[in-house]
């Protein structure tokens, strides 16, 4: 199941520094994390769905790339985002 429009707006308002700044790394990682959580639940139920599993791996990879970019650019924002998202780094 994908993210609803209301949930995406809530994530944008929670993680964006400005209201219209939807392209910031924090917002993108938050949206990707929400999609990863939904897709992980789907893959646990439908364990033979290899297309969704590949999509999940692609989402995790893109989030990892964004997080490594943020870690390179601003370590303080990176650690705050990791703590807010509840990731284990």
From Swiss-Prot:
| Biological process terms in GO annotation | translation
Q: What GO cellular-component annotations does this UniProt entry give? A: cytosolic small ribosomal subunit
Q: Which CDD domains match?
A: S15_NS1_EPRS_RNA-bind
Identify the InterPro entries for this entry. Ribosomal_uS15, Ribosomal_uS15_bac-type, uS15_NS1_RNA-bd_sf
Q: Which SUPFAM superfamilies match?
A: S15/NS1 RNA-binding domain
Record-linked Pfam families: Ribosomal_S15
Coiled-coil intervals, chain numbering = none
Q: Name one GO molecular function term.
A: structural constituent of ribosome
PANTHER family from the UniProt entry:
RIBOSOMAL PROTEIN S15, BACTERIAL AND ORGANELLAR (PTHR23321), SMALL RIBOSOMAL SUBUNIT PROTEIN US15M (PTHR23321:SF26)
Q: What does this protein do?
A: One of the primary rRNA binding proteins, it binds directly to 16S rRNA where it helps nucleate assembly of the platform of the 30S subunit by binding and bridging several RNA helices of the 16S rRNA.
Q: What is this protein called?
A: Small ribosomal subunit protein uS15
Q: Which lineage ranks, top first, belong to the organism behind this chain?
A: Bacteria, Pseudomonadati, Pseudomonadota, Alphaproteobacteria, Rickettsiales
